[in-house]
């Protein structure tokens, strides 16, 4: 997300990241029920961490995000069209790591921009990832997300297998592209590392 933000900023865009903080106990309980449902279908999935465990694990990442990225006000529930209007957004970009994997999202429809379907904005998926080459959506999710995907102005995916998943299950064409982390140069990452203390040689 940081890499794509930097690329878009260099193209002259103002970039906001929708800050979706999903780790509250209600969402975790909902996730646990969905994991149980997947297990009943024979899928090999694990229970997620509790909100406290997840927050502790992500603390270093959160510090990076707060320092280097421009965030909207955080939400623990679904975004709404009011969020888009508040920040005067004229385009929404979805991506990348496993954003289209239902078991990793409170409501995968939001990653197909359901909350903004009534708005006149550009919709783009850059390097969106299913995280697997198997289709994990329910029939209801497939039907609704296929309709939402058809509203996108452009769709690209991170994995080659995602091209086939989009065609076979969502009925849309997708392009296979680089992971956004590869859009930057080594010098860009060197700037981020300059304040990291270096270990002394043995």
Where are these regions (language model features)?
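Nucleotide-activated sugar donor-binding and catalytic core shared by glycosyltransferases
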Residues: 89-90, 156, 176-177
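Alpha-helix capping/helix-boundary segments
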Residues: 99, 161-162
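Short, structured coil segments at secondary-structure junctions
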Residues: 119, 151, 169-173
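Acidic anion/phosphate-binding donor-loop and adjacent secondary structure
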Residues: 134-138, 182-196
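A short beta-strand/loop micro-motif in the catalytic core of glycosyltransferases
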Residues: 152-159
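Helix-loop-beta element that forms the nucleotide-linked donor phosphate-binding surface
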Residues: 163-181
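Conserved donor-binding/catalytic core segment of Leloir-type glycosyltransferases
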Residues: 197-202
């Amino acid at each position: 997300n940081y890499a794509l933000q930097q690329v878009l900023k260099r193209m002259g865009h103002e970039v906001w990241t929708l800050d979706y903080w999903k780790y509250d106990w209600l969402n975790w309980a909902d996730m646990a029920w969905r994991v149980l449902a997947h297990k009943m279908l024979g899928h090999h999935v694990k229970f997620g961490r509790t909100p406290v465990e997840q927050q502790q694990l992500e603390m270093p990442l959160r510090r990076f995000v707060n320092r280097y990225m421009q965030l909207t006000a955080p939400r623990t529930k679904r975004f709404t069209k009011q969020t888009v209007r508040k920040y005067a957004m004229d385009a929404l970009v979805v991506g990348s790591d496993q954003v289209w994997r239902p078991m990793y999202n409170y409501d995968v429809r939001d990653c197909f921009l359901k909350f903004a379907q009534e708005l006149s904005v550009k919709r783009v998926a850059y390097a969106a990832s299913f995280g697997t080459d198997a289709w994990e959506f329910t029939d209801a999710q497939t039907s609704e997300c296929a309709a939402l995907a058809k509203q996108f102005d452009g769709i690209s995916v991170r994995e080659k297998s995602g091209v086939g998943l989009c065609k076979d299950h969502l009925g849309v064409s997708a392009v296979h592209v680089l992971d956004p982390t590869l859009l930057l140069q080594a010098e860009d990452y060197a700037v981020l590392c300059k304040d990291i203390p270096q270990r002394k040689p043995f």
